[in-house]
Amino acid sequence: MTGVILAGGKSIRMGKNKAFIQVEGIPIIERIHNLFRELFREVIIVTNEKDLFSNFNSKIYSDLIPGKGALGGLYTGIVVSSFYYSFCVACDMPFIKRSLVQHLIQNVANEDVIVPRTKDGLQPLHAIYSKKCIGPIRKSIEEGKSKIIDIYDQVSVKIVDEKEFLCFDPGRESFINVNTPEELISLRRN
């Protein structure tokens, strides 16, 4: 399985590249990258600023279809992955739990998507995708759609409800993302 980090966002609300924001003294991208290097045989970073990530010992790719947001990044990560399955996350999630990732990996059977569902809904940027998703993602992009979950009705999906994974991440910290300076300040206070 490949670990894919989507780091192509514009970070407009944050005002600077979210991947390099430090949480507990370590840039978020580094926290994720270190975990993924331990968990996966291949790690890919998808970004529109390849030079910023040149010091990471991973494969770095620009979007194959530029300007399509997370859906375009997901498409790129799955296409270039050497493996049938890819665990894909956003670069602004500083507290991804190893045990939760391992639990999701253990849920892989024959489905094309393995996605957790919290009380806030599906978490498509902390999920596993198969190569079978490539066609539906490309079709969604061509139709002008931007939501990852728009492909879910075209592939087989296994939803992992939070009651099944709360023992691995009781505070749901894996799904915390940092989008604004206010969220970062709040995160640092807690």
Model-derived features with residue positions:
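Nucleotide and nucleotide-moiety/phosphate-recognizing core
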Residues: 1-132, 138-145, 153-172
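Glycine-rich phosphate/pyrophosphate-binding loop and the adjoining helix
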Residues: 166-190
